[in-house]
Each structure stands twice: as structure tokens, then as C-alpha cells.
Design a protein with these regions (language model features):
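Periplasmic-side early beta-strands and strand-to-turn transitions of outer-membrane beta-barrels
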Residues: 155-156, 168, 175-177, 183-185, ...
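Extracytoplasmic beta-strand/coil segments of soluble accessory domains associated
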Residues: 50, 82, 86-123
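Outer-membrane beta-barrel signature, preferentially recognizing the C-terminal barrel domain
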Residues: 267-288, 323-328, 372-374, 429-483, ...
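N-terminal periplasmic accessory domains that precede
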Residues: 81-84, 103-106, 115-118, 134-140, ...
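Short acidic/polar hinge/loop motifs at secondary-structure boundaries
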Residues: 123-151
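N-terminal Sec signal peptide and the immediately downstream disordered periplasmic leader
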Residues: 1-88, 200, 242-246, 281, ...
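Gram-negative outer-membrane beta-barrel transporters
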Residues: 25-28, 386-393, 479, 506, ...
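Outer-membrane beta-barrel domain signature, strongest for Gram-negative TonB-dependent receptors
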Residues: 34, 229-353, 472
Length: 652
């Protein structure tokens, strides 16, 4: 896409935002889940945000939050969560091929490992991954009912890694005595996606079971390759809530997935494939005191990720990679409403993370696992005080005691001021971040036990304006400073670097603290109900993320676009048909630290439609990448061309 086209799309973002050039922040995203479409849009005061650990009206939140409702998710029709998130403000992603391959999500230019990912409040980040981040490659919509994206440093409440932000995925809960859902679709590249769930609720018990299956022949993960790289994913989930008494209840939840994806190297086709299994479990006891003013939760959360890669061409030892990561967390959380104006949230956590990893080869058929373990005990507290009508102040502290890195204290403050009967909302927040080195960075074959923790400071200020009961515009400026960021450092041959040799044997490289980085940017969001049937929404993000030290001082961080924009228009026809158009622009990025290798800009256009046959049955379809744009998010890795998909939804 040329600069003129980009300027046109950016201008459309501002026009959709209507007369004022002000205000992003958290609410617009609730009022119109960014550009996810009109479906699911609700009034600001009605939206409850749980991403900061306690339900509250979004106009009282001082940070930036995007909320995608179930209606918005269904309207978008996108199976992959990473692609859904990319339609929201400040979010970009990279992927080494098609759905199922390694996928990283960046929020506000932060590293992918600086995003904490949750399912129903349980952390998913894999301690055996290269820098402890979460691979979005296997995360499909499944039984998702809601997605909340909290942007900016959130380490006070969510701990280590919550630097760029938090993504909280909420699974569906039943509201009727018996209800179910079934979605089935098929389309290009031999793709099929089936998902369904059934559950029920009464005064004492609610339950739901869900399953999904995704299959695709795919396309070559190597950009100029000729063989298709397919992907399959099977998912299961379940949840149960039992009300023991009016004040005591039991929660049980679990999510399981198993995926297999073909993948290529960066320089050509291969027959390699990987298998990933992920298990998430939670058990919790909830009890209320003081007529519900004092709510308590004691819980145990467990995640287990197992990954294996195979190369059938290596007959002696086809297994080329074997890793597993586990998180075990005991937690207590309390919320106490002192009065209508003053609320507190506090808790303690004890977490153990473990990982093992090895890389067999024809030269070493059965190497020993590199193993690592870390224990972390934490306590946090947050106070939210509505000082006067419309003005809410929030402050919090977190204390971490890390087995290897000792104690650390973090702080965060925020303010939200609703003016003009809520039509104008001003927000500001400041927070600190802290990330201890991951287990892979410390103990793998590339590990370095001398690593220091990463430290961050971030702040933002924004304003939202509602106009004529038809439009919302928001604007936010953000800034983040980082010290001691950890990067992979390659070793030359021969090398005089002592860390390039372990037990007398040279290695490819190791992790080290090499960098200060800084990021600043502007996020703009707008939505306007042009008519009762036509809704237009848009967002634009400018991100200046760059190195601030060493030989790369002033260079942009790799694979972080400076410009991103989304535009969507949705029309509800009088006879029931719903149609929508979505346009996404991503500016050029650099594929290396020296900024000498460019990955080009691109524009994607998607078209979607749905039609209700009756109250229980709906048909839908979409065209992805309608103009068959050729593009890459990572150099030399392929992306999907034009695709046509159609399906049915059944609700009962």
C-alpha cells in the first residue's frame, strides 16, 4: 500500500471519529469494540471490566481497555484470536506462516513476552518458551464469550511480564436452564471449523461443556515454497459453579487443546511438524461476608504446556525439540467495599514455575533435559476511591519475593474523571513493571545465570468525548521506558566471549542484558452511528518503539510497525441481512536490529455477511484478503491469500 493510500485510511479514521481530535482510552473500546463491528456495542456506563481483577464500570478505569463482546466476536467471524486482537488499537502480531505456527502479539510496541495472557483469569504464559511468552498460534476462538485487552504496564495486579498489557479471555457461561450452541464452517484451503457447547443454570448450579475441531490444508509457511503446511487443533473446555450456600460457592474450570502444525525453516520448504498440548485448570472457593461487601476467593491454578517438533527426514532421530512448562499458583483475593465511594482489592499469591527442554539430533540422540525452576511469592493491594462525583482515583502496590532475584516493590496510580454527565472522560495512569529472567533464558542451552531483571516505567494520558449520542472519539498518548531488556546474542566462531563457551564446548549464542528501549505513541479511536442501520468505526496507532543504547541506539525495534490503522463499516438491512467491511493497514517494519532489512507495508480487506433464517439458525460468510494482497509479517514467511468461507450457527 502506498503512502497516499495510507493517508486516505488515516484520514478515514479521523473522519469516523467525527469533529474532535481527542480521546481514546478505555471506553470507546467498550462503546464500540474498536472496529469489531456494531454488534456488541453497548453504552459506556453499562460495560464492566474484569481485567483489573474486580468488576467495575469502565468509566472508573484510568487505564486503556478494549472489550470485545461475544456479538462482536461472532460478527467478525475470525477463528484465530491473534487476528481478532489485531483489529484493536495498539496491537500488532507476527506469525511464521499460517494459523498454528509460532505467533507473537505485541501491545504498544512491547515484546511479545511482555503480554500476559489469561483464560478466565488463569495465566497461560509458557515458562519453557524462549523468553517465557505465550504462543498465540494455537489459540482459537473456541468457546470464547468475551475478550478484554488492558494496555500499558499492569504488573501491580498481574505481576511479572504484564509490561505491554494483559489479554483476558472469558469463556461462555450459561444463563438458561438448558442452552447450547453449534457453529460449523468450511472454506478455502480445505479448511473446516466446528465448535459447539451445551450447558445450563439454575439457582444452585451452572455448568457448560464445549468442544471444537479445526482443520486446514494451509499454504507454504516458507514464502516462496510449493508444499502446503497444514494444521489441526482439537479443543475441550468445561466449567462448573456450585452455590453451596447463599454466600459460599465452588468454581471448577478447565481448558485443553491439542494442535499439530507443519512448518518450514526461514530458507526453504521442509517436512517438519510440531505438536503442542496445553492444559489449563482452576479450582476455587468463593465466600462473601458482611452482606456481600467483603468478597473472598481462594484458588489453585495450573497450566501445563508440552511441545515437540519432528523432522521425518532425519531417520535416526526424527525428534528435534522437546519442551514442557508448568505453572502452579495458589492465590487468595479479597475485595472490600468500604462504602459506595471506596473499594479495595488485595491478595497474596504463591507460584512455582518449572520447565524442561532439550534438542535431540543425529549427533546426540538422547540429550539430557535442561531444567529450571523458580518460586515467587507476592502480595498486592489496590484502593479505588471516588473522591467526588465523576472523579475516581486508583492506587496500588505489589511486593514480589523471587527465589533468585529477591524482593521488589512496584507501584501504580491512575485517575478517571467523567465530566459533562459522562460525555467527557479524562484518564491518566502511571505504572512500573518488573520481569525476572525467564527459565529458558536462565537454564536452557542458551541460558545465562548472570542475567538481571528487566525494569519498566510507563504512563499515559487520554480523553474521550461522546458527541450527539451518535459518536465517540478517544485519543491517548503513551510512553514507556525500559532498562536491562534481555536479548539473544549470537556467538561468532571462533569467539573470545567467555559466555560463548560452556564446559569447553562452544555454543550458538546466549541471552544477555543488552538494551535500553523506549516507546511512545498515540492511539486514536472513533465510532459514529451514521444512521440507525449504518455504523462506522476506526482506529489508528502511531508507535515509535526504538533502542536507546549501544550500537543500535535510535534504531526501531524489529517487527514493530510505526503506523497501523483499522476501518470498519457495518450495515443492518431491513430484511435481516447484516453486511460488513473491514480494512487493516500495517506500515513497514524492520526484520533486523540494524534496520537494514525491510518488511513491506500491506493492506488487507475483508468482507463479511450474515443472515438469520429464524431465531435459532443463522448463515454467514466472509471473504478474507479480498484483493489477494501479497505480504509478510516476518521476512520469508508466507501469509494467506484470498480465502472464501461460509458457515451456519445454531443457538438453542
Amino acid at each position: 500500500m502506498n503512502r497516499t493510500a495510507f493517508a486516505t485510511l488515516a484520514a478515514a479514521s479521523l473522519l469516523a471519529a467525527a469533529p474532535a481530535f481527542a480521546a481514546e482510552v478505555t471506553d470507546q473500546q467498550a462503546a464500540a469494540p474498536d472496529v469489531a463491528g456494531r454488534a456488541g456495542a453497548t453504552a459506556v456506563a453499562d460495560v464492566i471490566v474484569t481485567a483489573n481483577r474486580s468488576a467495575q464500570p469502565i468509566e472508573r478505569v484510568g487505564a486503556s481497555v478494549t472489550v470485545l463482546t461475544q456479538a462482536a466476536i461472532e460478527a467478525r467471524q475470525t477463528p484465530a484470536v491473534a487476528e481478532l486482537l489485531a483489529q484493536t488499537t495498539g496491537v500488532s502480531f507476527t506469525r511464521n506462516g499460517g494459523v498454528g505456527t509460532t505467533t507473537g502479539v505485541n501491545i504498544r510496541g512491547a515484546e511479545s513476552q511482555h503480554t500476559v495472557v489469561l483464560i478466565d483469569g488463569v495465566k497461560l504464559n509458557d515458562p519453557s518458551s524462549t523468553q517465557g511468552g505465550f504462543n498465540f498460534g494455537n489459540l482459537l476462538v473456541g468457546d470464547t464469550a468475551r475478550i478484554e485487552v488492558l494496555r500499558g504496564a499492569q504488573s501491580t495486579l498481574w505481576g511479572s511480564q504484564a509490561i505491554g498489557g494483559v489479554v483476558n479471555i472469558v469463556t461462555a457461561e450459561p444463563t438458561e436452564a438448558l442452552q447450547g450452541s453449534l457453529d460449523a464452517e468450511t472454506g478455502s484451503r480445505g479448511t473446516t471449523y466446528f465448535r459447539g457447547g451445551i450447558g445450563g443454570a439454575n439457582d444452585r448450579l451452572s455448568w457448560r461443556l464445549a468442544a471444537s475441531r479445526y482443520d486446514t490444508d494451509g499454504f507454504s509457511a516458507y514464502a516462496t515454497g510449493t508444499e502446503d503446511d497444514g494444521y489441526t487443533n482439537t479443543g475441550l473446555s468445561g466449567r462448573l459453579n456450585l452455590k453451596i450456600t447463599e454466600a459460599v460457592s465452588l468454581d471448577l474450570r478447565s481448558v485443553w487443546s491439542s494442535g499439530q502444525n507443519d512448518f518450514d525453516a526461514f530458507n526453504g520448504d521442509s517436512r517438519e511438524y510440531g505438536k503442542t498440548r496445553e492444559l489449563v485448570g482452576y479450582a476455587g472457593l468463593n465466600f462473601d461476608l458482611l452482606d456481600g461487601r467483603f468478597r473472598n476467593r481462594i484458588g489453585y491454578a495450573y497450566t501445563d504446556t508440552n511441545r515437540r517438533n519432528y523432522n521425518p527426514a532425519t531417520l535416526v532421530q526424527p525428534l528435534t525439540f522437546d519442551a514442557a512448562g508448568e505453572n502452579r499458583r495458589w492465590e487468595y483475593q479479597g475485595t472490600f467495599a468500604v462504602n459506595e465511594a471506596l473499594n479495595t482489592t488485595f491478595g497474596i499469591e504463591s507460584e512455582r514455575t518449572e520447565m524442561r527442554t532439550r534438542s535431540p539430533s543425529a549427533f546426540n540422540l538422547n540429550p539430557a533435559f535442561a531444567r529450571g525452576q523458580a518460586d515467587l511469592d507476592s502480595a498486592y493491594a489496590q484502593v479505588q476511591w471516588t473522591v467526588l462525583d465523576g472523579l475516581t482515583l486508583t492506587g496500588g502496590l505489589r511486593y514480589d519475593d523471587h527465589a533468585q532475584y529477591g524482593d521488589n516493590l512496584l507501584g501504580q496510580v491512575a485517575a478517571a474523571w467523567a465530566l459533562n454527565e459522562g460525555d467527557t472522560v479524562v484518564r491518566a495512569s502511571w505504572g512500573q513493571g518488573f520481569r525476572a529472567p525467564g527459565l529458558y533464558e536462565l537454564y536452557s542451552e542458551y541460558g545465562n545465570l548472570t542475567l538481571r531483571p528487566e525494569e519498566f516505567d510507563s504512563w499515559e494520558v487520554g480523553v474521550e468525548q461522546r458527541l450527539f449520542d451518535r459518536a465517540v472519539v478517544t485519543a491517548t498518548y503513551f510512553n514507556r521506558q525500559a532498562d536491562n531488556e534481555i536479548r539473544y546474542n549470537g556467538c561468532s566462531t571462533p569467539s573470545t566471549d567467555p559466555l560463548c563457551t560452556v564446559n569447553g564446548v562452544g555454543r550458538w549464542g546466549y541471552y544477555k542484558n543488552v538494551q535500553k528501549t523506549e516507546a511512545q505513541g498515540v492511539e486514536l479511536i472513533g465510532r459514529v452511528d451514521v444512521t440507525e442501520r449504518l455504523n462506522v468505526s476506526a482506529n489508528y496507532t502511531w508507535t515509535d518503539a526504538k533502542s536507546a543504547s549501544g550500537v543500535t541506539d535510535g534504531k526501531r525495534l524489529t517487527r514493530r510497525p510505526e503506523h497501523m490503522a483499522n476501518l470498519a463499516a457495518d450495515y443492518d438491512w431491513a430484511f435481516g441481512l447484516k453486511t460488513g467491511l473491514a480494512v487493516r493497514y500495517v506500515g513497514e517494519t524492520f526484520n533486523n536490529d540494524a534496520n537494514t532489512v525491510v518488511v513491506g507495508e500491506y493492506t488487507l480487506v475483508d468482507i463479511r455477511a450474515s443472515y438469520p433464517i429464524n431465531d435459532n439458525l443463522e448463515v454467514y460468510g466472509r471473504v478474507e484478503n479480498a484483493f489477494d494482497e501479497e505480504y509478510q509479517t516476518v521476512l520469508n514467511y508466507g501469509t494467506a491469500g484470498r480465502g472464501v468461507f461460509g458457515g451456519v450457527r445454531v443457538r438453542f
